[in-house]
Each structure stands twice: as C-alpha cells, then as structure tokens.
Amino acid sequence: MIIMKLIFLGTGAAVPSKNRNHIGIAFKFGGEVFLFDCGENIQRQMLFTEVSPMKINHIFITHLHGDHILGIPGLLQSMGFFGREKELKIFGPEGTKEIIENSLKLGTHYIEFPIKVYEIYTKEPITIYKEENYEIIAYPTEHGIPSYAYIFKEIKKPRLDIEKAKKLGVKIGPDLKKLKNGEAVKNIYGEIIKPEYVLLPPKKGFCLAYSGDTLPLEDFGKYLKELGCDVLIHEATFDDSAKDAAKENMHSTIGDAVNIAKLANVKALILTHISARYDKEEYFNLYKMNVKQYNESFKIIISEDLKSYDIKKDLLG
C-alpha cells in the first residue's frame, strides 16, 4: 500500500504571524516528496517534521509573490551544502527561471547538482509532468499575475482477472505480469491471449488539488469533480465578513473555499493561506460562524503549521 501524507510547513499569507509561517506544503507519495510553494523559512520548518530537503525532487510554485518563493534560495543552498547530486525539477509560471537563476547568484554556495526549470504558459488545464503511476496537472487561476493551481492524479493500472486468465489457459507466473503490463502472451495451447481478454478497468486513483492564491473559480470546482478529486487544499485568506477585501486582493474567503469544494464533490477540504490579521482562536471562531450555514458532508479542516495528515486514515477514512 502506498503511503500518502500531507505535511503543512507553512499556512500563512503575505505576512507571517507568530502561529503561521509563509506557505509551503509537502506531499509524500510512496518514496516521492513533492513541495508545493516555498515561502520564507520553509527549510527550517522542515526540521520539525519528517520532511528532508534531500528527498524533495519536485517543487511546484503557484505564482511569484514573495510569500510563495522566498524560501527557495536558502533551500537550494542547503541542498548543495549537504552534497545533493540528484536533479531537482522546479515548475512555475513565466518568470520562474529568472527567479532560480537569481537565487543561484546570491552569496557563496555549494550548488553543483542539476536544476531543471519548467515554465508554464498555458491558459487551459494541462499535464505538466507524468510518471508511470501519477501525473501533475496545472490549472490557470486568477490572482492578478500568472498563477496556477496544481492537481496530483494517481494513475492506476488495469486489474488482472486471474480466474479468467486461468480458464483461458494462461500459465501462472511471468505471463500474468506481461498481461497486466499490456503484453499479449501464448497460453498452454499455443493460442494468443491479448491483455483485453483478462484485464478489468483500473480502480480510481487518488486525486489531490491545491488552489494556490486565487479568486474563487466555479469552473475549477467543476473540473475537479470531473477528475474525481478527493482532497482539496484551498486558500481561505479571509473570513466571509471580509469579502470586499478578498475580492480586491484577488483572494478567497472561507465560504468561497467551501463552495468550490462543494462543486468539486470532494471528501475533504483543507483551508490554508490564512491572513495574519487573525489569531488562531479568532479564525477558528469565525470559521465556526461561517460554516454553520453550509452543513456539508465533507470534512473541513483548518490547516496548522507543522501538522501532518495520513491521507487514507485522517482525510478519507
């Protein structure tokens, strides 16, 4: 069983507070660790969690405001200091390459490992990275500058109907693996058995979405529903009484995030990117006031710095 965890390294907005660092979210999927946004001080936050900078091979930047990128220079320098050799892939909107190039000019450093930067220019949802068992989709959002939400989608292989394969005379052993991988084999009678004869549709894979900073976008919610999104991490910078401030600054409120989650039909919504104007208790009380009117069936969680979630146990269970 693949281990999937979310670790919130920072959950604050433009200005950090005593309780909330600048934004940064780590997602563990098996042996992979993905970092979504990298605000100031993120590498120190990692020291209090199970996240190792050396295990991060992919960084996804939603947009180029400082609270989402100012942790990159220090993180890269620490990776170099500890002798990293493996390539690091960084994805982000137009201008990301220049940010990374400038980061490498700051001070004396030991960065000798390869860094590959992928800039995103799309105005439509598009797969920006794909492996055998997952893909990452970028979805354009609205925040005044080029910005993207990111969607992690697990890819499941078709299942093998072993009993049917036996009845068709397939040898138990390597031939079953070949069929599962899409290769035809010969049965004990010398007949060709094609994969489609014995393969069942794959089970639905896990799907996670992170909004980044954005105005509420109904089309985003509808798109996530089409994908079968399970968990949505959505910014909720302001409470519902500050709708004008949210709109003016191109952010979302608690209610906005809940509405998008409802459209997406998710199992869990995690609110993050919370303004420093609220202390921890105040935001929680406003949240309770705001969500009373919604009475939704999905879980709603307020993110906290250094809090981790086992996705299957804590969010989908």
From Swiss-Prot:
The record's remark on the cofactor is:
Binds 2 Zn(2+) ions.
Listed EC numbers: 3.1.26.11
- MF terms per GO, please? 3'-tRNA processing endoribonuclease activity; zinc ion binding
Fetch the CDD domains from UniProt.
Answer: RNaseZ_ZiPD-like_MBL-fold
Enzyme class, one word?
Answer: hydrolase
- List the catalytic residues: 67
Q: Which reaction does it catalyse?
A: Endonucleolytic cleavage of RNA, removing extra 3' nucleotides from tRNA precursor, generating 3' termini of tRNAs. A 3'-hydroxy group is left at the tRNA terminus and a 5'-phosphoryl group is left at the trailer molecule
Positions binding Zn(2+) 1 in this chain are: 63, 65, 143, 213
Q: How does it assemble?
A: Homodimer.
UniProt function note: Zinc phosphodiesterase, which displays some tRNA 3'-processing endonuclease activity. Probably involved in tRNA maturation, by removing a 3'-trailer from precursor tRNA.
UniProt-recorded name of the protein: Ribonuclease Z
Q: Which organism is it from?
A: Methanocaldococcus jannaschii (strain ATCC 43067 / DSM 2661 / JAL-1 / JCM 10045 / NBRC 100440)
